[in-house]
Amino acid sequence: VGIDLRLWKNFTATAEVYYDHRTNILVANNNVSGILGIDPPKACIGEVKSRGVELSLGWSGQHKDFNYFVNANWALNDSEIVENGQAYQPYDYLYTRGHKVGQLFGLEAVGYFRDEEDIAKSPEQTFSVVRPGDVKYKDQNGDGRIDSEDRIAIGKSTAVPEMVFGLNLGFEYKGFGIDMVFNGVSGLTKQLNVANVHQPLRNGNTNIATWYLKDKIRWTEAMKDVANVPRLSTLSNENNYQTSTQWIEDG
């Protein structure tokens, strides 16, 4: 559904509301039992619902040899995975069905281990041996272990922003003109998995991102009560660098 208006010869406006229900998307059918011992076959069973609203406004004018224009656009998007052939999951929160396209899944970080006593009282850590200052995760299913079955939907989509907006303006005078374009998005989750943020000082990477200079407080014994990033280490530490709420930001 759309509306297109033109007023006063200079002003234009367009509004659109759309709904898209895609079916028969080719995906891997992981519902097939693994007993077969082969890769799951692909089948046209995928289904996605998309909804959105778009609005654009424009103004143009002329005064003698001077021409100018301003165009603005804004869009709000939403999507839902109805079916994607995902295999059976032991817990409902592990299913990607019902979530947005590109929804990120990971562990929920709940702080840092304060000391060895804290580690001993916590659930079993399966990703690596942990030390004080390492990231502590929530045991979502209460089984006393931190593993892949504790991953939940975190943040928002990493692929499709909820909102897109832009501004295009320019002018022309006697054959000379300038156009300017500004674009932006919001409602998107970005993973901080670049080397100088995610794992600095490892594998020959001697740089630490300026991201740490903002409001980041590295865990140390003296700063354990106010720290918001884990201890620094040059050694491998799989626990600290799992996909989790520790390493995401709004995009």
Provide a role label for each language-model segment.
Residues 43-46, 62-159, 199, 209-212, ...:
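Conserved small-residue
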Residues 8-10, 64, 176, 182, ...:
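Bacterial peptidoglycan biogenesis and beta-lactam-recognition machinery
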Residues 29-39, 141-150, 233-245:
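Flexible, solvent-exposed coil segments and beta strand-coil junctions
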Residues 69, 158-186, 214, 221, ...:
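Conserved C-terminal beta-signal and adjacent last beta-strands/turns
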Residues 103, 185-251:
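Extracytoplasmic gating/loop element in the C-terminal half of outer-membrane beta-barrel translocons
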Residues 1-104, 243-251:
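Extracellular/periplasmic, surface-exposed regions of secreted and cell-surface proteins
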Residues 25, 147, 189-193:
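A short, polar/proline- and glycine-enriched secondary-structure boundary/capping micro-motif
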Residues 16-19, 150, 180-186:
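Active-site proximal loops enriched in glycine and acidic residues that flank catalytic Cys/His/Asp
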